[in-house]
Amino acid sequence: MSFKLFIKNLPTNLCCGLIHIYRWTISPLLGSPCRFFPTCSQYALQALKHHGCIKGLGLTIKRIGKCGPWHPGGVDLVPMTTLEEALDISPAVDDDESCDLHA
């Protein structure tokens, strides 16, 4: 990986690292299951991987804002990018999805 690519992906990878820390430390203490599929932390990792740091964080904040008794939950997938829509590719739902960006 080039240094330029490393710097470009650094904010996204830092955010993903923070989400993994949350999943390993705080999430097990909460004990209550997420009302959505994929879970909010899985959603955040996917949003960051597919849309980058700024838009991914925006989508994540919007998703967390839905969390509460006023929303029924259910399936709420990360919106696709234009290229994914054109190729009809849906985002993969993977419990251990990383944010390693190689593009």
UniProtKB/Swiss-Prot annotation:
It comes from the Bacteria. SMART domains: Haemolytic (SM01234). It is found in: Cell inner membrane. Disulfide bonds: none annotated. One of its GO terms (cellular component) is plasma membrane. Pfam families: YidD. Keywords: Cell inner membrane, Cell membrane, Membrane. Could be involved in insertion of integral membrane proteins into the membrane. Belongs to the UPF0161 family. HAMAP family: UPF0161_YidD. This is Putative membrane protein insertion efficiency factor.
